Amino acid sequence: MARRLLLSFLLPLLLLASPALRAAGLSVGLAADVSSLDPHYLNAAPNIAVASHFFETLVAVDKDGQLVPGLAQSWQAINPTTWEFKLRPGVKFHDGSPLTAEDVAFSLDRPASLTQSPGPFTGFTRAISGKKVVDAHTLRLTTAQPYGPLPLDLASIFIVSKKAAAQATTEDFNSGKALVGTGPFRLVKFRRGEAVELARFDGYWGEKPAWDTLTLRILPADAARLAALLAGQVDMIEGVPGTDVARLKKDARFRL
């Protein structure tokens, strides 16, 4: 996975210490806290950004805002109220089990079950009135009336393992017990309010990440985040303080 894609969740202003390009591991200072690793619990940008390293969606959105294949290699409206999605073959979860249409159907149902969510994802699944698993790699979704934006909505719902998450709570995701996705990284450890530690998933179906490990340090204070970069404690930060941009542009150690 290219560096730009891997870190696409970060804000436009980035500083990267040059040696990090050659390192086996990358450490990033985040500007916002991550409240949960449950991908269906809270519809908030910091949580979604981190979840995107572990989980993927049926449909993706490219840098130009166009819909492109994700876990679904194709989709089509077979009548005004029915959409058919064909899953990408050969995709594995972090536990080695294959991705199936049953996992997708379960994942689309799950947001509605999280009744205590402070920011639910149900707005992206509300239009779906029915689901039919045709075979292991084919899922049909029906809507009560014609609904063209459905593929775009599905770009916001992460797919989880039904086996791992069927009886799981949000805390089971935070502990790592239920955190089984298809993404390029797997969870090593979540230290709430401090850091998220990740390791490359070698069974990933797509382009492999450039680094073996990724550490996301939670550093909401601008001064602390910048100090960590200058001290070599992190390789990259998001949210570079505007007052420091001009000075840092002149520092050959970093790229802005």
Residue ranges and their predicted role:
Residues K131, V188-A199, T215-L256:
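Extracellular/periplasmic solute-recognition and catalytic clefts
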Residues Q76, T122-A165:
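Surface-exposed binding/hinge segments that line
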Residues S8-A17:
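Bacterial N-terminal signal peptides
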Residues L26, V104, H137-L139, P146, ...:
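Alpha-to-beta junction loops
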Residues S74-S117, R140, R225-A228:
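Aromatic- and charge-enriched surface segment that lines or borders ligand/interaction sites
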Residues Q66, A155-P209, T213, A223, ...:
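Gly/Pro-rich hinge or "lid" segments in bacterial periplasmic/extracellular proteins
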Residues A24-D33, Q73, T82-F85, V104-L108, ...:
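Short, well-ordered beta-strand elements
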Residues G29-N79, D109, A178-G181:
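N-terminal lobe/hinge region of extracytoplasmic solute-binding protein
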